[in-house]
Amino acid sequence: MSALSLLILGLLTAVPPASCQQGLGNLQPWMQGLIAVAVFLVLVAIAFAVNHFWCQEEPEPAHMILTVGNKADGVLVGTDGRYSSMAASFRSSEHENAYENVPEEEGKVRSTPM
């Protein structure tokens, strides 16, 4: 069996390479650029798809939303009778339906001329 293997190996090393193993030459520079851009766009699309499915924000659980009265009460527009935890930080202590404007530090506020 080993003699047969050595004979086949010897024949394969003696045979010249096939013509299809020789390259035809480099691609044109514009074709290389086009292929590089296409590969880059495919990789970016894959990254966006992975980011979309991997980093999805889970919906807020229902037990964290507290109902405080009916819609006729003075709650934030769009909350439909649900208490918003964001509103607690700027509610006014003077009136239950009033909100205070919280002053921002000068460095955090960005303004652009109109």
UniProtKB/Swiss-Prot annotation:
Parts of the chain on the Cytoplasmic side: 52-114
Membrane topology designation: Single-pass membrane protein
Record-level GO cellular component terms: apical plasma membrane; extracellular exosome
Highest taxon, organism lineage: Eukaryota
Region named Disordered: 94-114
Modification Phosphoserine occurs at: 85
Cysteines joined through disulfide linkages: none
Ranges in the topological domain labelled Extracellular: 1-28
Compartment annotation: Apical cell membrane
InterPro entries, A to Z: PDZK1IP1/SMIM24
Biological function: Auxiliary protein of electrogenic Na(+)-coupled sugar symporter SLC5A2/SGLT2 and SLC5A1/SGLT1. Essential for the transporter activity of SLC5A2/SGLT2 but not SLC5A1/SGLT1.
Family in the record: Belongs to the PDZK1-interacting protein 1/SMIM24 family.
Subunit structure: Forms a heterodimer (via N-terminal transmembrane helix) with SLC5A2/SGLT2 (via TM13); this interaction enhances SLC5A2 transporter activity. Interacts with PDZK1.
Name of the protein: PDZK1-interacting protein 1
Organism: Homo sapiens (Human)
